[in-house]
Amino acid sequence: MSHPLRHARWAFAVTAVTALLLTAAPAATAQVSGAAAAAPAPAGDVVIAAPATFTHPGVLVSRPQLDFIRGRVNAYAQPWRAAYDQMMASRYASLTRTAKPRAVVECGSYSNPNNGCTDEREDALAAYTLSLAWYITQDSRYATKAIQIMDAWSAVIQDHTNSNAPLQTAWAGSSWPRAAEIIRYTYTGWSSASITRFGNMLRNVYLPEIINGNTYSNGNWELSMMEASIGISVFLEDRTVYDRALAKFRARVPAFLYITSDGAFPKGPAGSTIDTRAEVASYWQGQNTFVDGLSQETCRDFVHTGYGLSAIAHVAETTRHQGQDLYPELQDRLRHALGLHSKYQLGEAIPSWLCGGTLTKGLGPVTEVGFNALNTRMGIAMTNTQRLTEQQRPAGTNNLFVAWETLTHANNPN
């Protein structure tokens, strides 16, 4: 059974929505419009609203991007062919995979306890992997297996519990709509009843856990929560959820990535009481010297910083597919952040003013999407990011929510 407290939180959020917001929502999506009143867009930024008509497939990867990938792989061109071969050799592409759904997924801090957490994340990644395999090969066995996995979970899952529930929900909830978008809009074998049930799962099990964000957590949490919320909103074609999540995302990014134009020190998370330099320094893991590209989690470790960087690029990519280009708004933060972390990941000496002269590296396979957007499409030189990205190719998966991005985004002009 779902936990009563979670439904109480969701019910409270629903009652908080203004009548205007409810009447503005499409009738078919009124129950989700539901999340809460939208956060204001960052001061001075242009208003960006959900598209009147959603583009499908349109979560992280678009049809033109998928067509480009298929052409490159079939031409045995590199680095795409090596990336494809890597994906197809992984356990996620197996046609004998058996999904392991459960009604309640319980995830504690640092995976203690881990009751279905790995199973859920990896089944969601497998569904996405298989959807890519389907599109590239046009072998219906891969689409059928992806559908089996998605149907297995939508028939069973009811709740996420324990302290890591929001992050777990965000990670799996980022992968599911990528898979579902590709299968729903490029394959004819997924029944309308199954599609409806899957959408209900995303709406009723996933969204309540993530849509309201998490103000005082480390930034990667809320960024991933908004990535999942935006992907889900595209699949559901829910403009109100899209707007809500995008506003919260745009407000969070400046509290995660600093640039000197922000002022003497970074912004605190929107809605928080973190606003003095001392409070910000404490929230930024004790760092008190701020330079272009520094992240709120740099001095924690590069792994969690990478989660946030990846979520930022994923959201920007999805919204671009939906007709809004966030990259001009994000480009300075993202290019400086990718460059700074790539530089030290590559081995440059760490100055004493940065995290006390000690960094915990491990950025992960998270640079391809942002690098492709800024360098390939926008022509911005990114020497260190390019070196690290090319050195790490083919980028695999972090087994959480990032997968196969050399395949999907390396030098992809679309």
Please describe what each predicted stretch is.
Residues 1-38:
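Secretory targeting and sorting signals
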Residues 29, 216-217, 303:
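Short acidic, glycine/proline-enriched loop segments that cap or flank alpha-helices
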Residues 41-217, 223, 227, 247-253, ...:
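Extracellular glycan-targeting catalytic surfaces
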Residues 135-138, 233-237:
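Hydrophobic/aromatic side-chain positions at a characteristic register within alpha-helices
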Residues 228-232:
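Amphipathic alpha-helical interface segments
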Residues 240-244, 302-313, 317-321:
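Active-site-proximal binding-pocket segments
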Residues 257-298:
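Flexible internal linker/loop segments at domain or repeat junctions
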